[in-house]
A protein has these predicted regions:
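Extracytoplasmic/secretory soluble proteins
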Residues: 17, 22-497
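Sec-dependent N-terminal signal peptides of Gram-positive bacterial secreted proteins and lipoproteins
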Residues: 1-25
Length: 497
């Protein structure tokens, strides 16, 4: 139900409030002059800038020690750019709705988390909620621009304009099958031959016959090889292979039928739980009651998952990593058009994404209180970080300047760079659909999709019976009009590339 509410909010949108952008015409990330004063690229010392307080809305569960850490952060940012940060964490379940209210009310703020899935980047950018950043970044964000993978900066542009600073992390999106390695080794199973959903059958059979307390499959939506428009479960998509210039209804494609037939076969054989379509079980890693699950990968994700689970997890890829709009806009920071200090906000984002001290302070907390640093520069969490300062690392900023944990591979960030280099751009990377002309039809189609897709994608119903009924209702809801509108916008976009 939460996905339905989020999507409807994204589609129906809200009234944007435009405000004049003012603020100090100051420089960017400070440097040290001959008198050991902090200076900007414009030659101003930090002290010469009028003090600014920047309001920053960030997604994540509020943490007990935020105020303590922000005292250290603000001492540093005041010295560097004469600004202090008013960090406001909004919990995961309320962030999207709260940001809509904040935006429609015209409340003044400076920076906010935005993405393809929360505080929607494309919709807010088109409706004037975010400041265009191209010139600001060139003037005040030079250091971070050198560090952020160009694929993020290019792929996140809407009609040639960038409206938020992407988090430098894994740029590609890759679905993998993750296995409970205790069960793999116990039954001497060979996962090296698993390259698709269909390849799982003999392994699932062994688990079903020998592990009565284990679900062979931890419930997941089947992977389908498309670049989706709007949400993954929605029907509008472009193919990754073949004719990539035609928008399609993915539920009319042969590969979808074959994949969902496999899922339903597994469901009938008891490899998938009988309540898969309605269950809210999140399948926590620390509970080893599963054999295989689908996850989104990043380099050395196995180490992260194994650390969280308390037992080893191993993986097999379902496809090569692709760069989608959703992956380049998965975590970003935007500057509000209501901000009175957009230049200073950009200076802060530049510092956040290029200064390892500030980035680690916001992410890990205070050394000696929240974490300890080893002689080799690696770190380990203390109880205070786990219990009182567990921040959403991916949502803050540049991942590749974070300290490594003591059990992280030494080449972790180099592996990220290799992963990004080898990620393949989607044929439609950079095309952002404006849903406003067909928002009524999309709302109706969303209702139909929420009725049919959960059971279909999880294998709980026969696709040969269910998909025809699903498609009939989609077209009754206005499917063809939406497909035509997407195609028209795409053709215009493609002609201008």
């Amino acid at each position: 139900m939460r996905k339905v509410v989020l999507l409807l909010a994204m589609v129906l949108g809200f009234v944007s409030v435009l405000a004049a952008c003012g603020g100090d015409q100051a420089g960017t990330d400070p440097q040290t002059n001959e008198n050991n004063e902090e200076t900007t690229h414009e030659g101003n010392t930090a002290e010469s800038l009028e003090h600014a307080t920047l309001v920053w809305y960030l997604i994540g569960t509020p943490q007990q020690d935020v105020d303590q850490v922000m005292e250290e952060v603000n001492a540093y940012t005041k010295e560097k750019i004469n600004a202090t940060i008013d960090l406001r964490l909004l919990d995961w379940g309320e962030f999207n709705e709260r940001m809509q209210v904040i935006t429609t009310s015209g409340e003044e703020y400076d920076i906010a988390f935005t993405s393809s899935w929360a505080n929607n980047y494309a919709l807010n950018s088109r409706r004037g909620a975010f400041v265009e950043l191209n010139d600001l970044m060139d003037k005040y964000g030079k250091e971070m621009k050198e560090l952020i993978d160009p694929a993020f900066l290019e792929g996140a542009q809407i009609d040639g304009k960038l409206f938020a600073v992407p988090t430098n992390k894994e740029v590609g999106q890759q679905a993998v099958l993750a296995f409970n390695n205790e069960l793999v080794e116990k039954h001497n199973l060979d996962i090296s031959t698993v390259n698709s959903l269909a390849d799982l059958e003999p392994l699932l059979k062994v688990i079903k016959e020998n592990e009565s307390d284990v679900s062979p499959i931890a419930t997941f939506d089947a992977y389908l090889p498309f670049d989706s428009i709007l949400q993954e479960e929605m029907p509008f998509a472009f193919r990754i292979d073949g004719n990539t210039d035609e928008v399609v209804n993915k539920y009319e494609e042969d590969v979808t039928m074959e994949t969902l037939k496999t899922m339903h076969d597994y469901y009938k054989k008891g490899y998938i739980r009988s309540d898969a379509a309605t269950s809210t079980d999140s399948w926590p890693l620390e509970t080893p009651n599963w054999f295989v699950r689908k996850e989104l990968y990043q380099p050395y994700a196995e180490s992260i998952w194994s650390r969280a689970a308390g037992y080893e997890i191993v993986t097999r890829p379902l496809h090569e990593p692709y760069v989608f709009n959703n992956s380049v806009t998965g975590s970003m920071q935007a500057i509000s058009t209501t901000s009175k200090n957009p230049e200073r906000a950009m200076m802060f984002l530049n510092l956040l994404n290029s200064d390892p001290y500030l980035r680690n302070l916001l992410d890990k907390g205070i050394e000696g209180i929240h974490y300890e640093e080893n002689e080799d520069g690696t770190i380990k969490d203390l109880d205070a970080r786990i219990e009182r300062y567990n921040m959403p690392s991916f949502a803050i900023g540049n991942q590749l300047i974070l300290k490594l944990y003591e059990d992280d591979p030494a080449d972790k960030w180099e592996a990220f760079e290799d992963f990004n280099t080898n990620s393949v751009p989607s044929p439609v990377l950079g095309f952002y659909f404006d849903s406003n002309p067909v928002r009524t039809e999309i709302a109706a189609i969303n209702n139909v999709t929420s009725e049919f897709s959960p059971a279909l994608l999880k294998g709980a119903v026969d696709p040969e019976e269910y998909i025809p009924a699903f498609n009939k209702k989609l077209y009754e809801a206005g499917m063809q009009k939406v497909l035509d509108e997407i195609q028209s916008q795409y053709d215009e976009w493609k002609a201008n590339q």
